[in-house]
């Protein structure tokens, strides 16, 4: 979670609030009746969500990682529990096993459609180079069966209609429709046709619904400004109308980070570009209703090196369209808002336990293999209490088999792995990687002369080394997914750490279609003999907590880049008054900041009401944004110094004056 920051305002050093204890992992639930997006601060891409009775279920893309297609369950849409993987492994040839120089990077299994019908859970999902696959189970916990469909249906979505017919839509821009056969594994003869022409402006990543007799299809547009075009019709035969603004441009102020275009070294990495709003915006998702009659939206957004994240949005129906967001700010989702009223409550928890001492006889659900693993070449039993990875031949980490990873966690986290290198043989390499392309790692190399610490960075092509006398070593990666940089350290006693190598730039690209994975690896660079093994005693993942709202404290506010604090009638310090649900009033001299009918903000005397209440939120990089409860818009300071409650949301470049930094007085 985000860290308790020392905020610097116009040259001042800010006073820090008390930092709460470190927590195990990001939780969207704030514990005060609100939640903060994303639902998980680790990659969960191409989400699809259903409700079955009082339970909600969620799955998403896993590409080449095994096991795949996680199934999560929730009662409140905010706190999710891992239930199962629908796919233990998908072994459809050498490329799925990293054999014969082949791989499935950027491919694999993706864009699942989750449905429940007549007592059976269905997940339809695409596989590159194969036909669409259908997974079925009578319980979300499994067991799941797999059957290939006879066609490949790009980014499909399935609707079990109330007349007994089963429709499937798929495609990019040009949307096609057909009926599925009774066994759901083929298209009905003569039923395929184009439903919506490319010129209508639909994207891909479809979600197909029938609501109150009307048909809806949500889609994902990823060119330039990302958004979610939605089509609707009274009948399947049309006419279909398309709305481009149901969810558009909501990036929570996040700009484009480092990007990589080349697939092989030397890698061309472009620097961050905050001047392009909407390039990280929410764009692929759908909607779901609650037992109480509310509607909520879910959608993924590109969040740079950490991967694509899933966000939750209140839905406001206007003129028959399910807009993400709130009245008077349609299409723009609040990052922090009141939790859904589902009629149920859940304790605060995360889906996974990230730290692992490998004491169990099975891998924890957080772990996934890079491609199909080689059974018999890894173990939790050969030496109880450790993960043993046998070194298999590979020229480098990209080609190494049995690399075990977990999705990296943002916005800032530290991963520490404990390695016993005594089992390595000359030519073996083992360690901790920030795996993507380009990747970086810190580890131990064994040569004929002994052990050496090494740190390699694929971005720069540089390797750094240090002598190692011990066989036991602690390997650490400090990750900042706001700046998208990382650094590596090591220790020989578990207490004192030394840096190795230069800071690593974590770039995002479509080479893997994934974010960074914190990964444990062991491979062998020689082929003259069988390799040894690496024993990992433990992995510890720690995160820095989000700052608390400074209730009861006097603060000053300033716009980044401006030299003076905000002033209202000469008042520059405001007491933060707790209004409940993460909302505040800002009080000074017996008055409160208040939003007038013209949306101009001024200091008004009297008690605080809706016009004086603001939802306290933060951008991903920790700047404060304040949403007026009266206008559902955000405060911004215009170039002349006036403050207005009329911003749809902060821009990534910060030039709109809609983000603030604060310090305690």
Language model feature labels by segment:
Residues 547-665:
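Lectin-like carbohydrate-binding module/patch detector with strong preference for beta-trefoil
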